[in-house]
Amino acid sequence: MFESILVSLVPISLVFELCALALSFYLKDSRIFFIVLSMLCARLTYLLAPFYQAHLFVSLFLPLVFVLFVVLKKSVLVFEKKSLVKLAVLVFVGILGFVLCKSTDFNASMSEKFFDIAIFTPISQVSFVFLVAEFAFLLFWGAFKGELHFGVAFGLSFLQFCFESAQKVGFFEFGALFFVLYLVYHTYKSLYFDTFTKLPNQKALKRKLLGFTSCYLGALRVSGFEHLEPKDEKILFKKIGKILRKQAKNVKVFCVDDDFIFVFEKLDESVAREFLR
């Protein structure tokens, strides 16, 4: 039963990888695109060697490629001159995989046991050490850059290599599923939320008011910042939005151009006037 579930995860993760690849290409997220593309390319290794030998190679080099594609400078478009470096990395690792998968010395060195691990039973302790180090690096890097989703995706992508019972089938991962969910959520946020204030935008306001028979609306217009630099004005709007998100309880706040719109659903007029005073 358990093995049949593992077998089914292989094609399921492949489907999510294709979905993540298409979504990231459409949304022009070059980092996620090339990370997922590297996962798809890694599957070719399993056509050249048995599962065990392919796992040894993929468990060491695919996480390295993942980290490399995260830290490389993000390109505006998916395919441009900067992308040639990433394509070259994929070609180089692919050639390396063709050679090392059939290397007895490489497979023997990767299979050596150096210590006992209580919880995990990795296929290779060498690759496991690198996995832990890379995972910790991405968590710290993501916390510093505000991009923790890459650390989460990394952990979900290589769980298979941490447990011996999961090594009997081909490559599967959960990182592509996470990327699909992230891209869908990110698209939703960009459509219905203001970029700077993080408050719902005009589209969200229109959707909110659909079906309302009665409610009170209030508006706060922010003006007098013409002398400020555009960068400083955005910072100020961001701070105002942060204050309103914390202070406006039981009131829905929306950002429409230079105005903050308040929607009072179940409050009477006197309470609404008092809030806006």
Task: Put a short name on every predicted segment.
Residues 1-188:
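Regulatory sensory/coupling modules that transmit signals to nucleotide-handling catalytic cores
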Residues 192, 202-216, 224-245, 254-258, ...:
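Conserved long alpha-helical elements within nucleotide-processing catalytic cores of c-di-GMP signaling
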Residues 263-265:
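Short hydrophobic/aromatic beta-strand micro-patches
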